[in-house]
Amino acid sequence: MDKVKIIEAKESLLADNDRDADRLREEMKQQGTYYVNLMSSPGSGKTSSLKQIIARMKDRFRIGVMEADIDSDVDARTIAASGVDAIQIHTGGMCHLDADMSRQGLSAIGSEKLDLVFLENVGNLVCPAEFDTGADLNVVILSVPEGDDKPLKYPLMFEKADAVLINKIDAMECFDFSLDQVKANIHLRKPSVPVFPVSAAAGEGFEAFCSWLSGQIQKQKEGTRQS
């Protein structure tokens, strides 16, 4: 019986994507565009949180948003109404974006004219964490109704996070959710990651996050000037 040749396609695919993501990250850095990847479950409040962030940062930064979904343009229309450039990326049934899809989106939105680009990734706590988009930061949004145990159940997502927003804190009294416990669970996965409790509905808590994000952008600009 002939031997069956086995190809580890996933490992090769991820390695190729990682290399492309590193190239894209360097291109964006040299261009002067900061790129942020937002990840979460569906319904956790990515779009509503983005609206709060945009309102606080659009006077200082030229902002663009790429909305990734399997179908529809609802989120892109919502963001465009906030007064920033927005495009919709349809993933053709895929549950994530990779570096090449990011590159296509960044070209389409005209990232060379922007200081800050947000990618609202497909709503999913599994696939998006596996693929490097070339972003400078990965920001994870976890909402109170999802429960404080999600960092234990989806470790890779929180290991990849550079910051975590805990959204819908205005609804905490309605759910069995502990802010202290969720922070402990997050830091079990990544001890140094900053956690920001927010409420997109009430507009609370975003000043601290926007201040932190502005600081990250400034650090990159200073590093680029020194290199």
Across the structure, where does each feature detected by a protein language model lie?
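Conserved C-terminal guanine-recognition region of P-loop GTPase G domains, centered on the G4
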Residues: 128-135, 144-192
